[in-house]
Amino acid sequence: MNIQDAYNEWSEIYDSNINRTRDLDAKVTRLMLNGRRFPSIVEIGCGTGKNTEFLATIGDSVLAFDFSEKMLAKARQKVTVSHVRFAWADITQPWNCPPASTDLITCNLVLEHIENLNHIFAQAARTLRRGGWLLVNELHPFKQYGGTKARFERGADIVEVDVFIHHISEFIHAAEKNGLKLLKFDEVWHADDMEKPPRLVSFVFVK
């Protein structure tokens, strides 16, 4: 199912259905960023605002993008503080952000839906200030190799969303090509699947 239609439909149950990857991503985001403060944050793929709520507590200004209008509608209901702004965006196109304007960019469970990683890293590098961070959390490619992908239930049916497999080296090479250095890296398991491949891969790159 194409990405925009899928997430518009998924928005109705995204916050309530069982989703270990969503829950683990929220936990890892908080662990990676807790204790730091950022004057300006751009969130790529904010969804229903599951991480926006947290980002609002560590950022003086937050701009949150998403490709799904219905996901954005949920996020706007959830996060109403004045220093958070939501906007529709197609991140495969040039981003509507001034150069060197942002201290933190977060990209959570988004890049499996993007074919060209280089464009994303190029736009992030252009938007970040010197010393700024790019946090990327993604479904681990080991899970993808086994057939796992973004999906949700529609009654008795399972709806799978269009995805692309990106190896860990692809993230690192795309970052290096655009002048970003790897600062932190982790592979993360959910408590329910400790004997299985890691569920998430997490990177922090710095400009």
What are these regions (language model features)?
Residues 1-36, 50, 54, 71-74, 135-162, ...:
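Conserved class I S-adenosyl-L-methionine
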Residues 44-93:
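Class I SAM-dependent methyltransferase SAM/SAH-binding core
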Residues 96-104:
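A short acidic, Gly/Pro-enriched loop at the edge of an enzyme's catalytic core
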Residues 104-117:
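A short SAM/SAH-binding and catalytic strip from SAM-dependent methyltransferases
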Residues 118-130:
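A short glycine-rich, Lys/Arg-flanked "PGG" loop and its adjoining helix->strand segment in the class I
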Residues 163-185:
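Short alpha-helix
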Residues 192-207:
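Core SAM-dependent methyltransferase catalytic element
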